[in-house]
A protein has these predicted regions:
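Flexible "stalk/tail and boundary" regions
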Residues: 1-8, 12, 22-78, 83-84, ...
Length: 163
């Protein structure tokens, strides 16, 4: 699982060093594509292939679905690491995410986000918004209780009841 934040730089050739603990999650490389917030998303191959399967089940007759297809797939590239653990970001993806100089790598569960440091800092207020966070967390059950009421079982994250 991709968790945590890392601060690095992108060099003039578009290469970003990815920490070894994150590279360990991507032994075969992955797929790099546009994110939804002027960032990039780096997926493990198996997760991107699952995403592709799910997205391609959507009908292409709806304009919003075609927009999603284009957003995710037209800019996607395979991502491989060089000998010293850097991933190459093509110019059009650097432009999309406004990457130059300082960058932030942010874990997002089953993928890694790559942000310009300035965009990441600008979005800090939104991430800290307690009202929005409350609404998002209301979508899942964070009680983590087992049937017997003990809190020592593995979490069962599912939709929260809407009573």
């Amino acid at each position: 699982m991709f968790i945590g934040e890392w601060y690095h730089t992108i060099d003039s050739k578009g290469r970003i060093t990815v920490p070894s603990r994150l590279r360990d999650l991507l032994p075969d490389g992955g797929y790099l594509t546009r994110g939804f917030d002027r960032n990039l998303m780096l997926y493990r191959r198996k997760d991107f292939e699952r995403l592709t399967t799910r997205v391609q089940q959507l009908t292409s007759t709806k304009p919003e679905n075609r927009q999603l297809f284009r957003h995710l797939f037209s800019g996607a590239v395979t991502a491989q690491f060089d000998k010293i653990g850097r991933v190459m970001v093509p110019p059009y993806l650097r432009d999309y995410a406004r990457l130059s100089g300082e960058v932030t790598l942010a874990g997002a569960g089953n993928y890694l986000e790559i942000w310009s440091a300035a965009e990441w800092a600008a979005s800090a207020e939104q991430r800290a918004n307690s009202e929005m966070n409350g609404q998002q967390f209301a979508l899942i059950d964070l009680a983590f209780t087992s049937a017997g009421g003990a809190n020592d079982s593995a979490p069962d994250i599912g939709p929260a009841s809407r009573a």
